[in-house]
């Protein structure tokens, strides 16, 4: 990696939550890349003081060569916050600030100014309370990048789970799963496992939608009418697919030891297993974007803000994975 390709942009997320704490904790060690934090400088300096941690900020200079990040320092891409932040207390006046940091970081990642984007947790409810329609990071970045399809995947060192659908009510899931959508999702998953994870021939295990994967049509017809035909077409294109398998049996070592990724049909089908197995060590990845995006696997934890007790493990894992994905993409 060279110059701007040695830069990762970070958004701390909700200012009243643990995001700023975790970014400051990241700064307490050396990093081989430049960490450019898109945030209000005063917010970070105040929070560092509250945490009794050293922090020096240097302003981001796009035209200068990227520098490895030294412990105790961060590079700042400034965005001014609207109202004073009280740790643990949401303020609707700061919702536009949160969205502005996401937009600024996303635009820099799209342009190639940054090699990857790593996000801290946001509070979706307070953003919507401000009158800003916001489903989540995944959908926001997809819309801003003009991507008609992206794929949400969570990963630990041992397991990767991608989703055929994301933040939908359960009632809406069957209608959202079509042969076209599965073709798009699985093609993105297969491509990004190759290009961003360095897996030359990924093997993807696919969950059925219904109990027992439909039990031959006795517990639903989506497998027979949609999932099985879609997988057959994709296999003809050279994608290694196993399934559809019942979700309650797929998540066993005899299957997972061979799986480079699992495709779950909906959010709560696959993610509870992954989070139980590796909560605090999991990373949220958005596949199909024109840039690398990783994130923590937890929420804003308002009650922990400025207490010094927040666990930085997931943020460190997300940042390390982003660096690894950058290296894989450059090979």
Curated annotation (Swiss-Prot):
Organism of provenance: Yersinia enterocolitica serotype O:8 / biotype 1B (strain NCTC 13174 / 8081)
Superkingdom: Bacteria
Essential cofactor(s): Zn(2+); Mg(2+); Co(2+)
Classification lineage: Bacteria, Pseudomonadati, Pseudomonadota, Gammaproteobacteria, Enterobacterales
Catalytic activity entry: 4-(phosphooxy)-L-threonine + NAD(+) = 3-amino-2-oxopropyl phosphate + CO2 + NADH
Protein name: 4-hydroxythreonine-4-phosphate dehydrogenase
Residues the record lists as binding substrate: 137-138, 275, 284, 293
InterPro entries with a match to the protein in the record: PdxA (IPR037510), PdxA_fam (IPR005255)
Gene designation per UniProt: pdxA
GO biological process, one term: pyridoxine biosynthetic process
Cofactor comment text: Binds 1 divalent metal cation per subunit. Can use ions such as Zn(2+), Mg(2+) or Co(2+).
Compartments in which it is found: Cytoplasm
């Amino acid at each position: 990696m060279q110059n701007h390709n040695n830069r990762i942009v970070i958004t701390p997320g909700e200012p009243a939550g643990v995001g700023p704490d975790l970014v400051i904790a990241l700064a307490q060690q050396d990093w081989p890349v430049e960490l450019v934090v898109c945030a209000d400088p005063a917010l970070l300096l105040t929070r560092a003081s509250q945490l009794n941690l050293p922090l020096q900020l240097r302003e981001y200079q796009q035209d200068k060569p990227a520098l490895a990040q030294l412990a105790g320092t961060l590079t700042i891409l400034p965005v001014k916050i609207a109202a004073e932040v009280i740790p643990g207390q949401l303020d609707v006046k700061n919702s536009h600030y949160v969205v502005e940091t996401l937009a600024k970081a996303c635009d820099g990642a799209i342009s190639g100014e940054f090699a990857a984007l790593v996000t801290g947790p946001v509070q979706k409810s307070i953003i919507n309370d401000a009158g800003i329609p916001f489903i989540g990071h995944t959908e926001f970045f997809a819309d801003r990048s003009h991507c008609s399809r992206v794929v949400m995947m969570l990963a630990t060192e041992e397991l990767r789970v991608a989703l055929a659908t994301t933040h939908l009510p359960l009632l809406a899931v069957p209608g959202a799963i079509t042969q076209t959508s599965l073709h798009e999702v699985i093609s993105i998953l297969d491509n990004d496992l190759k290009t961003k994870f360095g897996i030359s021939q990924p093997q993807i295990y696919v969950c059925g939608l219904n109990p027992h994967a439909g039990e031959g049509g006795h517990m639903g017809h989506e497998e027979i009418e949609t999932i099985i035909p879609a997988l057959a077409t994709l296999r003809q294109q050279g994608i290694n697919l196993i399934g559809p398998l019942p979700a309650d049996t797929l998540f066993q070592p005899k299957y997972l030891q061979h799986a480079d990724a699992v495709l779950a049909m909906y959010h709560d089908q696959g993610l509870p297993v992954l989070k139980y197995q590796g909560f605090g060590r999991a990373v949220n990845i958005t596949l199909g974007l024109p840039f690398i995006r990783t994130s923590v696997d937890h929420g804003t934890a308002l009650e922990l803000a400025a207490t010094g007790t927040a666990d930085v493990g997931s943020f460190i894992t997300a940042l390390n994975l982003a660096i690894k994905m950058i290296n894989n993409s450059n090979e």
